[in-house]
Amino acid sequence: MSKERTGERKVEIQVASDSPVSLAQLEGKDVVVFDDMVRTGSTIVKCCQALKQGKPRRVLFCVSHFYSSEEGRENMAAGVIDEILTLNTLPTILNRDTQGRLRKKMVVLKIEKWISRHLRSYFGHPSGALAENFYAVDMSSKNPRWKGARG
């Protein structure tokens, strides 16, 4: 996707001219969008709206640092984003009350365990026994996401 800022809070999104994939090729597929940080969610919502024109099965948004404002949480609660995958790099991400309705579509990965595993491997230590629920933090067991896709 190609992004052009037309103002402080205005963004135009379109398929990049050099993209090897057209919107039509997305039909029935899972689409994953990556970003480093989200605040207001305006850009990612516009991007996902454009992608939804291709009729994908679902759109998954992966973001390293989920630091969203109230406006951002409202924007991303819309139906254009089916699931949000993020890391626990910011303490507020684990506060269910702060995330509101988004927790129904959110998966949080524990980055400290990934770092620990890499460092243990790097320094030649065996991985040893680790917690069974190694990567995910269940934001809401009452609202499981994508049961069919997760097995």
Predicted regions and their residues:
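PRPP-associated nucleotide enzymes
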Residues: M1-G151
